[in-house]
Design a protein with these regions (language model features):
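Acidic-enriched catalytic cores of C-N bond-cleaving enzymes acting on peptides and small amides
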Residues: 181, 190, 197, 211-215
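Flexible glycine/proline-rich, aromatic-decorated loop/lid segments
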Residues: 187-203
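Short small-residue beta-strand/loop micro-motif enriched in glycine and branched aliphatics
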Residues: 108-110, 206-212
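N-terminal helical capping/dimerization or prosegment-like subdomains
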Residues: 2-91
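Active-site metal-coordination/substrate-binding segment of hydrolases
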Residues: 74-146
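Acidic/histidine-rich catalytic neighborhood of metal-dependent amide-processing enzymes
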Residues: 116-191
Length: 215
């Protein structure tokens, strides 16, 4: 049993290494094909788990949607994540190739290892393990929503959600893009800071006014 566990762990690490090797930099046009190839890998992975998986084209980078076989009467959990990564410049400051994973001091170093490919794959592999333990079934219906533009502002996501609202209907959303309080402390993050903008318009006189008279 220990040998089987060890083999399974190595297989999962190999899958993570494969995912990390895609230079899926959404901000750079020259990596558009790499982003698309990464999306295709995720589709293949989810399809191999029995999910109905599609890489939907957008005006920029694909949105991957994977759905488990639906079982009536069970709630639906949507797991959101992103497979795009930040640029690597200045590359000369890296101790190793950012797209060739390297283990140092028990840690995996590669672009995207903790934002967000590690978390994303952890959820996928967790669902796969649940399937294995339950004869291919899941206690809930699962939808994976994996985008390729999070690092550039998710420009295609809003329209995609509007166009696929019914298809993505769910009871609970889990965001697969957070960290842990400590390496040995599993963590549920239930809130993050968002973005807010404001435009302030100030109107006043066209000439200086005496504060003692007009103030």
């Amino acid at each position: 049993r220990a040998q089987a566990w060890s083999h399974g762990a190595m297989n999962r690490l190999d899958q993570l290494a494969t995912l990390l090797r895609f230079p899926s930099i959404s901000a750079q046009k020259e990596h558009a094909r790499d982003v698309s190839d990464c999306a295709d890998w995720l589709v293949d992975k989810l399809s191999g788990m029995g999910f109905e998986a599609v890489a939907h084209k957008t005006h920029r980078h694909p949105v991957v949607v994977g759905r488990s076989p639906r079982e009536e009467g069970r709630p639906t959990v949507l797991i959101y994540g992103h497979y795009d990564v930040q640029p690597v410049d200045p590359v000369e400051l890296w101790e190793s190739d950012p797209f060739e994973p390297e283990v140092r001091d028990g840690k995996i170093y590669a672009r995207g290892a903790t934002d967000n490919k590690g978390q994303l794959l952890a959820h996928i592999l967790g669902v796969e393990e649940l399937q294995r333990q339950n004869g291919g079934h899941l206690p809930v219906n699962v939808i994976f929503l994996l985008e390729g533009e999070e690092e550039v502002g998710s420009g295609s996501l809003s329209l995609f959600l509007k166009e696929h609202r019914d298809e993505l209907a769910c009871d609970v959303i889990v965001v697969s893009d957070t960290g842990m309080a400590a390496p040995d402390t599993p963590t549920f993050s239930y809130g993050l800071r968002g973005l807010a903008g404001a435009e302030i318009i100030v109107k006043g006189p066209s000439a200086d006014l005496h504060s003692g008279v007009f103030g």
